[in-house]
Amino acid sequence: MSRPFRFGVVLAGVLLAILSTTALGTVSVTRVLTTSPPNVPESIATDHRGTTYLSLPFASKVVKFAPGGALVTVATFPSFPLGVRLDPEGNVFVAVVGSGIWEVPAAGGPAAQVAGGPGLWNGLAFDHRGNLYVSDSGGGAIWRLDKNGDFTLWSGSPLLKGTTAAGPCGLVHPAVPSFGPLGANGIAFNNHGDMLVANTDFGEIIRIPTNPDGSAGTASVFSGPACNLWGADGVGMDNADNLYVAANSKGQIDRVDPTGHVEVLAAGDPLSFPSDIAFGTGRGDRTAIFISNFAAFPTSNGAPGVLEMDAGIPGRPIG
């Protein structure tokens, strides 16, 4: 399915569209952790014990902290670590820009590279078969690392590409001058086995069905283009098959229901360029969303760190 044609908008309308969304969010956001540069978190994940993992790209490391605990370094990397996800056994997988995918054993120890390549590796997700997928945001593609260790292109649909032109809010994404086009970003699977992909520059969610043989089906636009999805970054799913999106350049958290309808849950301070979300795992935390507040391109006065909000629906915390 091709993208709908994008109409230009006048600057006054653009600014009104961006600013008006701050009043739409109804869920309160609280602060869990405050950090300072270079320790600004881009991706976030939680394990079954409630330990939180953060990628700190400008410090070239991944750290973790238990509830109420201090930051502990998990591993350092040769370049910027972005996406962080855990498998059901607690092994930590990290997407490293220009390097590939790295794994840190659940029991601890040095990180080992399990897939290599020059992409802008970013979002990670496991399917129900245990295969690991990663987005190449710069190349606009999804790659798969299967259980045999084979690393291959899974989908190169044009819908996964980014752009250097203005997005759905009428503005160029703020990261484009530094990193170039940013297409496929956060990824997650719905209950039907379809992959949902955040397209950062275009403010879209792309749906890619999985064929019976595990190959990628034909990609289509599931939601957007929408100003409320501009800067769509990290994503996560709840048990009702809703997709949660950290819209970084909008400074907000969105919920996209199974029909593609977008609801703004939270916007404005303290959210500042939020880049990823993870559902809680502990007792009383299953409906909690933990947010990596990247603040690399500030959208408010909110400091970098970790924030928390309640989604009202239990999430899928692992993978």
Language-model features: locations:
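A short beta-strand motif characteristic of beta-propeller blades
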Residues: 28-35, 69-75, 110-115, 151-155, ...
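Bacterial N-terminal signal peptides
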Residues: 10-20
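C-terminal region of N-terminal signal peptides and the immediate post-cleavage residues
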Residues: 18-29
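Blade-level signature of beta-propeller repeat domains, shared across WD40, Kelch, NHL, RCC1
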Residues: 278-319
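Structural signal for beta-propeller blades
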Residues: 60-63, 100-102, 140-143, 203-206, ...
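Short loop/turn segments immediately following the C-termini of beta-strands
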Residues: 57, 96-97, 137-138, 200-201, ...
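Beta-rich, blade/repeat-based domains predominating
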Residues: 35-52, 77-100, 117-132, 139-141, ...
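Short loop/turn segments that connect beta-strands within beta-propeller blades
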Residues: 65-70, 104-109, 145-150, 209-214, ...
